[in-house]
């Protein structure tokens, strides 16, 4: 008798995506992050839903409603910290997932890669708006600084900022609309993730060797379901360690002070996962130039397939390209560190050098390394 999963229309869909899916036999733990991102998304939606039941998106009560969740709601503290630190885990998995794609040449699956970039932008927008909701000092001033970047748009900039704010400053109208978008965007992200998977299953997964895996495939279940569950447990171990031992490690102490438009914090900075882009923004003295550099630091990912000059897909057997890749990783870590430092010497100079190096590595060094490798292997 044919199993139900192969006959029922709904079960058939799940079966083809998660159970009988033919997968390459040699994919490593680096291929775990897709499923971990799915788990993070579910966690964020569930915890966010429970937080939304008790949160009030009003400038006069938002801060105290978060305090109420932490103090008075049953297990409110763990729901809140799971949501806040879950976002950090989400971005760690996201960066590792993108890093894997860059290293193993997964960006050559254009549709999947482009939907992935849209997913990254949507996730960043969601996280930014979520950071505003507790209505602490860093929430308020972070929102003010980041939304103010729109004023750099020529001619319509000021009108654009006031349109986003819903007034002449970040206030109640801003908070209400940010809450609305923060609530709806994760569901849009879920739809985009389904699209991401749809495009991926059109081509099949890449593998570390960067060669065709058509001759040698295995069923996704039980081999990769077990592997993914192991990854999930490791992720939960990290997340729960963070939540239960040092829940405020990645947060900002200023956010425990209620938003005050008359008092500016000494160092305004976004959450840690935006610091690399923030450092690039601050490195350009001109406002419009800074905003363009900020946008390009993310959108440059869309140019990666066009900059691929190598004759091999994966970097596994390309030592020069590996060198440029790890240079890029170190550079991003440097930018993240600089983004959290005050705007003073020597941090300004380090930030500017790192920003130039970031774009140079992607636009010049990586394609050049690939061309040299082609010559060395006589693959011209």
UniProtKB/Swiss-Prot annotation:
Main location as per UniProt: mitochondrion
Keyword Transport part of the UniProt annotation: yes
Residues that span the membrane, as ranges: 33-53, 77-98, 113-133, 178-198, 226-246, 288-308, 320-340, 347-367
Keywords: Electron transport, Heme, Iron, Membrane, Metal-binding, Mitochondrion, Mitochondrion inner membrane, Respiratory chain, Transmembrane, Transmembrane helix, Transport, Ubiquinone
Cited SUPFAM superfamilies: a domain/subunit of cytochrome bc1 complex (Ubiquinol-cytochrome c reductase) (SSF81648), Transmembrane di-heme cytochromes (SSF81342)
Molecular-function GO terms, alphabetical: metal ion binding; ubiquinol-cytochrome-c reductase activity
Membrane topology, record value: Multi-pass membrane protein
Record's GO cellular component terms: mitochondrial inner membrane; respiratory chain complex III
Gene Ontology BP, a term: mitochondrial electron transport, ubiquinol to cytochrome c
InterPro entries in the record: Cyt_b/b6_C, Cyt_b/b6_C_sf, Cyt_b/b6_N, Cytb/b6-like_sf, Cytochrome_b, Cytochrome_b_C_euk/bac, Cytochrome_b_N_euk/bac, Di-haem_cyt_TM
Necessary cofactors: heme b
Its job: Component of the ubiquinol-cytochrome c reductase complex (complex III or cytochrome b-c1 complex) that is part of the mitochondrial respiratory chain. The b-c1 complex mediates electron transfer from ubiquinol to cytochrome c. Contributes to the generation of a proton gradient across the mitochondrial membrane that is then used for ATP synthesis.
Subunit annotation: The cytochrome bc1 complex contains 11 subunits: 3 respiratory subunits (MT-CYB, CYC1 and UQCRFS1), 2 core proteins (UQCRC1 and UQCRC2) and 6 low-molecular weight proteins (UQCRH/QCR6, UQCRB/QCR7, UQCRQ/QCR8, UQCR10/QCR9, UQCR11/QCR10 and a cleavage product of UQCRFS1). This cytochrome bc1 complex then forms a dimer.
Record-stated family: Belongs to the cytochrome b family.
UniProt miscellaneous comment: Heme 1 (or BL or b562) is low-potential and absorbs at about 562 nm, and heme 2 (or BH or b566) is high-potential and absorbs at about 566 nm.
Protein's name according to its UniProt entry: Cytochrome b
């Amino acid at each position: 008798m044919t199993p139900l999963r192969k006959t029922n229309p709904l079960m058939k869909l799940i079966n083809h995506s998660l159970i009988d899916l033919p997968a390459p036999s040699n994919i490593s733990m680096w291929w775990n992050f897709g499923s971990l991102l799915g788990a993070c998304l579910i966690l964020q939606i569930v915890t966010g839903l429970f937080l939304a039941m008790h949160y009030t998106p009003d400038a006069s009560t938002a801060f105290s409603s978060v305090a109420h969740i932490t103090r008075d709601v049953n297990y409110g503290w763990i729901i809140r910290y799971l949501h806040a630190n879950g976002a950090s885990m989400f971005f760690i998995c996201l960066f590792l997932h993108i890093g894997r794609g860059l290293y193993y040449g997964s960006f050559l699956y254009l549709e999947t890669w482009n939907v992935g970039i849209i997913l990254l932008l949507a996730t960043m927008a969601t996280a930014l708006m979520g950071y505003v909701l507790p209505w602490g000092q860093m929430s308020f001033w972070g929102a003010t600084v980041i939304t103010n970047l729109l004023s750099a748009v020529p001619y319509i900039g000021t009108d654009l900022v006031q349109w986003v704010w819903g007034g002449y400053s970040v206030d109640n109208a801003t908070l209400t609309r940010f809450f609305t978008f923060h609530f709806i965007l994760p569901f849009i992200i879920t739809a985009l993730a389904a699209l991401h998977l749809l495009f991926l299953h059109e081509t099949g997964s890449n593998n570390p060797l960067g060669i065709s895996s058509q001759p040698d495939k295995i069923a996704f279940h039980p081999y990769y379901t077990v592997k993914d569950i192991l990854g999930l447990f490791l992720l939960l171990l990290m997340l729960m360690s963070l939540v239960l031992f040092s829940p405020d490690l990645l947060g900002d102490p200023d956010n425990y002070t209620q938003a005050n438009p008359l008092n500016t914090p000494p160092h305004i900075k976004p959450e840690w996962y935006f610091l690399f882009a923030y450092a690039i923004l601050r490195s350009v003295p001109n406002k419009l130039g800074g905003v363009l550099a900020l946008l390009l630091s993310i959108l440059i990912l869309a140019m990666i397939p066009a900059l691929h000059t190598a004759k091999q897909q994966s970097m596994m057997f390309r030592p020069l390209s590996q060198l440029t890749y790890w240079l890029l990783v170190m550079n991003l870590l440097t930018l993240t560190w600089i983004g959290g430092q005050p705007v003073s010497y020597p941090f300004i100079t380090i930030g500017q050098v790192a920003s130039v190096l970031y774009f140079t590595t992607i636009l010049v060094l990586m394609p050049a390394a690939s061309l040299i490798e082609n010559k060395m292997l006589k693959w011209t």
